[in-house]
Amino acid sequence: MEAQNQEVAALVEKIAGLHAAISKLPSLSPSAEVDALFTDLVTACVPASPVDVAKLGPEAQAMREELIRLCSAAEGHLEAHYADMLAAFDNPLDHLARFPYYGNYVNLSKLEYDLLVRYVPGIAPTRVAFVGSGPLPFSSLVLAAHHLPDAVFDNYDRCGAANERARRLFRGADEGLGARMAFHTADVATLTGELGAYDVVFLAALVGMAAEEKAGVIAHLGAHMADGAALVVRSAHGARGFLYPIVDLEDIRRGGFDVLAVYHPDDEVINSVIVARKADPRRGGGLAGARGAVPVVSPPCKCCKMEAAAGAFQKAEEFAAKRLSV
């Protein structure tokens, strides 16, 4: 136990130092200094760690919350930079692999789809919402092109400039794919009747960064989504909670959802994935989300991960080498 406490203390000290350095940056736009500091931060947070961020003291907790906001701002600058770069090409979708973390989106989207079909059997979505899509809507793109070819995607973001950048990526895209992707400038808190039309809602990790904000978003979704509709929530686990908010499963249950599965990656995919379903009284909703009944899905064995990674890399190359089609 003492060794674990020392490990946690050393990690928190390292991350606090990186937070201090990042806070002093004149800008969070992509640069050698910005890239180096955030690379160091991710490198520190990705390995398995005994840290429980919920048990941090007030000072460390405040540092963590501010760090998540800095990460969000830096991510926004990075995505805007690459969205503008991609938009300069005649067919932007041919060049997606230029984004350094594109492969992570391919892997994360496949993971989410696999969990969805495994734990929500028989689901065949025709209308999907992605809340917090940003200027590079890679997740919707990968899901629409490779996993949900019959679904129409409504992408929501509060930032009009982000949506405009996202639309520009589809210049020259296959008409079938482009016709299935719509972008709306709206805060999820203002959506009501629209939410009842979706079979699946994906909630991005940085929508609602503070715990109470996240709980409020989930409660709003629960109040307006259709009974039986699926909710896929991105979260974090362990030290990765210094990069992204950790979603409390009780907040999901209180929002009116059955929590079906939780997955904590142990590789370069940063986000945990939570699959839930809006409780449906006609199907005995509420039983699957009982305390202790949620399967925490283990990452696959190393050989399986290598095979999956090889397949994802090949898919990423194919995705970037030709125009998307459905």
From Swiss-Prot:
Protein's UniProt keywords contain Signal: no
Tissue: Expressed in roots.
Species: Oryza sativa subsp. japonica
Induction description: By iron deficiency in roots and chlorotic leaves.
Stored InterPro entries: Nicotian_synth (IPR004298), SAM-dependent_MTases_sf (IPR029063)
An MF annotation (GO) of this entry: nicotianamine synthase activity
EC number: 2.5.1.43
Cross-referenced Gene3D superfamilies: Vaccinia Virus protein VP39 (3.40.50.150)
Domain of life per record: Eukaryota
GN (gene name): NAS2
Family: Belongs to the nicotianamine synthase (NAS)-like family.
Reaction catalysed by this enzyme: 3 S-adenosyl-L-methionine = nicotianamine + 3 S-methyl-5'-thioadenosine + 3 H(+)
BP terms from Gene Ontology: nicotianamine biosynthetic process
Keywords annotated in UniProt: S-adenosyl-L-methionine, Transferase
Keyword Transcription recorded: no
Protein's recorded name: Nicotianamine synthase 2
Transmembrane spans: none
Function recorded in the entry: Synthesizes nicotianamine, a polyamine that is the first intermediate in the synthesis of the phytosiderophores of the mugineic acid type found in gramineae which serve as a sensor for the physiological iron status within the plant, and/or might be involved in the transport of iron.
